[in-house]
């Protein structure tokens, strides 16, 4: 299986492996015997065990038969010698007549020339159909053609004959795409031929040139076809173990039309669950485990990408992730950022891979020498109680693209409510709320409540309509200093709100409409309310009576915005969510259907009414389109009547249309709306706690962004811990009680249980690291492969 190509025998005049595995002997020829008259037809009759009519081995169609190995291609240029994946030619042998000048002799020569031109097609057909004897014959024929050329042209000529010009696919790739019982033997013969003619390096590392599969090599195909023996043979023969397949088929943008695996052979083996090949590649001295693809992803990024939501897939991904990380022993492999600035941990959060995210966050390695690869450390344990330290690297908001921010703000993932229940995210948010967020939330509520009270009082005691609008600074007994201060406070606070919410809206991605409708709606309503207040003030300054319309709308919207502060309480936080979801999911759809009915029936009824005389007081209320629409709307809410006016052209038809409209809208649509709203409320109630936690998490992060940098550093969570030699991490301590799990074989950072003096993160200096905790008392049993605990 691991035979080196130098151990393989050349094809001509030496031993060649027969299909059955027993080598056949080619007798060495004298120079005079090299070119017999019927060489092309009867050369292999001299080979022991050769059969004139070999049985073609039938193969099963390959997995990628259409995208990578199409057997039908139209020859447009007429140069069918360069066609990819040629059809099987007829190999009938034409006997050469005795008279070389006869017409039959000329036809025979022409047939021989056509066979030479079809040599590439015949080689590709032989390797795809598993015809070993025919392949050997064709390679000998190809080698004879090479003797007529200059030595410097031979390598290029051979590569041209062994490679499809339109796709860059070699006959070696063709053989691997059509697996059959003779594939391994065919690969050996091709490698031996390439080595004998000094083209092994070019031949084995040839890449696809077609855009869809650009960069794919024979090693990639062997791994994808799960041919471990052939993959080992190619690696031993010098295949490039760091080749990158960059075609569109392997691009994650087209994941529904292709397969993304990270481009490299190692990543392909890992993503397709082939641990033997992964081990073989990692043991190879030329394999670059830290290699990154064109998107900046390394092998761990690729594993996160292929993970799915079902258990079987996640189990093998976690095993591969574990195996690669532990065998490499390189902590930086997990901290590498791709072109989007995401580590494998952050990528798992962005893609909503909850199981993989949980595994990475809580990975605890029990072996002492590899403890630095953990993200969870057991500080001490006593019975069922243990104190765990969770690494906050790339988790807290102190870093860009933190897991916490990605999870809270990414509306493209449906399970972010579930992801926020994972540790340490759950405890981290709870500690932030207790430390500063709840106090800021209460102050914000007080200020906004006082703002609404002041706005209401100022609006209520405004000059009435019968009075002239006074100058704003004309302080009389009716308008004193208190009212002026109230108006100034309302104006200043409204300007502050408009600036704050305007910046927040500007920072939102316009393309993320779902985020705006689901999470960021309060930014818009607060901004609109503040703008209405400012607009009413300026209209009042210039003595426009229209200021009252803006003022009334601002008051109504201001008190409605108080629902935002219900998210501070779990029992009341559902009201705003229910109202939001009912409006966006149910009411908008109802209004669309209702407006269609309203306009249609309004036009119909208005068309049935004749023009009324001006002196007729009993004129129909359906005399115009606008009047008809208004009357139909009254019928919808139960305020209209079904009286028939005398001036309708067809009273029976008029009545029929009214009754139909009432049935469709008042009876059918309204009851459907009520049913849909009830279903929405029920669904929200089932996820009430998770939705409320997501609301509160977004509120916490919004308030944290408002803090200045010096204050944010004071409120930073975690403690600096020494987890290994010269390895200090900012960790979050979580005490856990597990009656089903006893920490008997886990290495502890401290022998003695109980609380210890925590290091204040804000007071740590570089010199204080020598005074950090003394660690590394272990009780584990050293094993060949360290276990992990999730």
Swiss-Prot record:
Q: Which reaction does it catalyse?
A: Ca(2+)(in) = Ca(2+)(out); Mg(2+)(in) = Mg(2+)(out); Na(+)(in) = Na(+)(out); K(+)(in) = K(+)(out)
Topology relative to the lipid bilayer, per the entry, is: Multi-pass membrane protein
Q: Which CDD domains match?
A: TRPV3
- The transmembrane residues are 431-460, 480-508, 520-540, 546-566, 570-608, 650-686
List the residue ranges of the region (Disordered).
15-34, 52-71, 76-112
Regulation of activity: Activated by cannabinoid that binds to the vanilloid binding pocket. Diphenylboronic anhydride induces pore dilation and enhances cation permeability by promoting the conversion to a homopentamer.
Where is composition skewed (Polar residues) in this entry? Answer: 95-105
Give UniProt keywords alphabetically: ANK repeat, Calcium, Calcium channel, Calcium transport, Cell membrane, Cytoplasm, Disease variant, Ion channel, Ion transport, Lysosome, Membrane, Metal-binding, Palmoplantar keratoderma, Repeat, Sodium, Transmembrane, Transmembrane helix, Transport
Binding of Na(+) occurs at: 638
- A Pfam family recorded for this sequence: Ank_2
Where is it chiefly localized?
membrane
> Which ranges sit in the Extracellular compartment?
461-479, 541-545, 609-620, 647-649
Localization per Swiss-Prot or TrEMBL: Cell membrane; Cytoplasm; Lysosome
Mutating residue 573 to C has which effect?
In OLMS1; gain of function mutation; results in constitutive channel activation
- The keyword Magnesium belongs to this UniProt entry's keyword annotation: no
The intramembrane ranges come out as: 621-646
Q: Which GO terms describe its molecular function?
A: calcium channel activity; identical protein binding; metal ion binding; sodium channel activity
Similarity-based family: Belongs to the transient receptor (TC 1.A.4) family. TrpV subfamily. TRPV3 sub-subfamily.
Per UniProt, subunit arrangement is:
Homotetramer. May convert from a homotetramer to a homopentamer to allow pore dilation. Interacts with TRPV1; may form a heteromeric channel with TRPV1. Interacts with SNX11; this interaction promotes TRPV3 trafficking from the cell membrane to lysosome for degradation.
Q: What does this protein do?
A: Non-selective calcium permeant cation channel. It is activated by innocuous (warm) temperatures and shows an increased response at noxious temperatures greater than 39 degrees Celsius. Activation exhibits an outward rectification. The channel pore can dilate to provide permeability to larger cations. May associate with TRPV1 and may modulate its activity. Is a negative regulator of hair growth and cycling: TRPV3-coupled signaling suppresses keratinocyte proliferation in hair follicles and induces apoptosis and premature hair follicle regression (catagen).
Q: What is this protein called?
A: Transient receptor potential cation channel subfamily V member 3
- Cite the source lineage: Eukaryota, Metazoa, Chordata, Craniata, Vertebrata
* Encoding gene, per UniProt annotation: TRPV3
